Amino acid sequence: MLLRFRSKIGMNRVSCEATDLFGDVVENWVKEVGLNVDPGTVVVGNDPGSAKEPVSNIAGRSVEEMGLKHGDIVYIEYSDSSGSNEGQSVPVNAVGAGSAVISELPVDVLLEKEDGLIKRTRSSLCKHGDKGMCEYCSPLPPWDKEYHAENKLKHISFHSYLKKLNEATNKKSSGSSYIPPLSQPDYKINKRCNNGHEPWPRGICSKCQPSAITLQQQEFRMVDHVEIQQSDLINQFIESWRATGMQRFGYLYGSYEKYDSTPLGVKAVVHAIYEPPQHDEQDGLTMDLEQVEEEMQKVDQIAMSMGLLRVGLIFSDLTDTGNGNGTVFCKRHKDSFFLSSLEIIMAAKHQLAFPNASRFSEQGKFSSKFVTCVVSGNLDSEIDITSYQVSIEAEALVDAKMISGSTHPSMAYINETNEEVYVPEIFYMKTNEYGLTVKENAKPAFPVDYLLVSLTHGFITEDSKNQIKFHSTGGFPWANRQAMGLSQDYQELKNYLYSAATGGDYNLLHEKISNFHLLLYIKSLEIFNEKDWSLLITSAISENWEQPLIQLTTTESFNSLVLIMEMI
């Protein structure tokens, strides 16, 4: 149905459903006409001059409950907002709430302050003194193509890309207002188009339908490197496959930090792996998504108290060669695939679920820093890790439900247009047999390589500034490993911790409690109050752990834990 809104700027039509909340309809009207509205002043009425009902009072009622029908006129009055909200639409539902503050990651705040210039020394072409500078030795911008080609860097970093766009979009010589250089692509058809026609699938126009899409390999990457704090972390993860022959899936917990090996680079530092409930098989696995999501929300909250974020996912794809020497088949290479179409879609859904906050984007978010790691066989038949992200175009295609998996893992199938989804023309650029770049129609399927962004990976180095957060990765069973005959219970807790908790060796006790899975289990017992829990976390992961640990052993919570172990 269409509602007509009469205001001081004229008549405007807004498409809606009878079940839509009236507050949402008014908010869509604000967005469509691009108004600068003070939400506290918006009032509506049925007749000219009768607009006295504040929208905030009726925002929670549906259009049907308001008695509005197709074609009805709503008279609306408002005052223009001013100040810091200029040029931005404000949600009318959130009366009294200030404009949203975008909370960026600390690493983004840090890198935004740096220029990232690539310094160069004097060369033989320089004709000046030590204090001079010329075109042969002046610093290069962080996105310089020749520098990246010489150093074999396939992608520029996100912040290099951002500075490149910002320099082109907001030139210093221009006196115009600031324009956000980033915009999250949206390939979905606009079902609220107010261009005088019924919504899709009963009507369509050039304004509401998405434009043709041309896929290109992404030149930047949100994360440049994945750093795993301990090699034993991966060994513990693949121990499940070694014991059962079944594949395994887990989430990576860690943080994002500055990466010095590329200009303005970012790395995901992995401190722990958590395996959600799953049914493993030789060629895949099955999960109850609702159960997994419920459990992971709890783990996320506990991990946050340790200063950790869910930074990615990891899964295995291993098949033993049968030679008895620990070798595995190499399944993923340039002549087969690196990530299958189904895995691309899975990665895109996770990236959409973990958006990257950015104040330089029109939407306040841009792509994601969530990474995908695969443990599989390399060309030497050794167990190895590869790390990826999918492009921002992949995120938009999956969000718009335009692609699905195919029987060929290296190809993504393009869905047909239906009542819910409008699929425009999709093309991709390729080099033909004559070495020329040509545009190909992507339907019915196209190579998933156009959606893939490869990352580097490695383990912590001796000179790394990062402190190892958890000193123990094994000893205490990981969660959800009942298929291996392992479970987290009081007996396992006693076997792992009791002697250290009562022996008086604080170094040993620190090493034992510095275990991600032990801490999660202790939290689930609900023995520790908030104060003692904070003390336990400090004792487990802090550099200066001695005094907090001594204090911890005197608390009622810790002594209750020891008492429980004694009773087993």
Swiss-Prot record:
Residues 226-366 form the MPN domain. One of its GO terms (biological process) is ubiquitin-dependent protein catabolic process. The keyword Membrane applies. It holds the Pfam family NPL4. Keywords: Cytoplasm, Endoplasmic reticulum, Membrane, mRNA transport, Nucleus, Protein transport, Translocation, Transport. It comes from the Eukaryota. Gene3D superfamilies: Phosphatidylinositol 3-kinase Catalytic Subunit, Chain A, domain 1. One of its GO terms (cellular component) is perinuclear region of cytoplasm. Coiled coil: none annotated. Signal peptide: none annotated. One of its GO terms (molecular function) is ubiquitin protein ligase binding. It is found in: Cytoplasm, Perinuclear region; Endoplasmic reticulum membrane; Nucleus membrane. It is a peripheral membrane protein. Belongs to the NPL4 family. This is Nuclear protein localization protein 4. It comes from Vanderwaltozyma polyspora (strain ATCC 22028 / DSM 70294 / BCRC 21397 / CBS 2163 / NBRC 10782 / NRRL Y-8283 / UCD 57-17) (Kluyveromyces polysporus). The gene is NPL4.
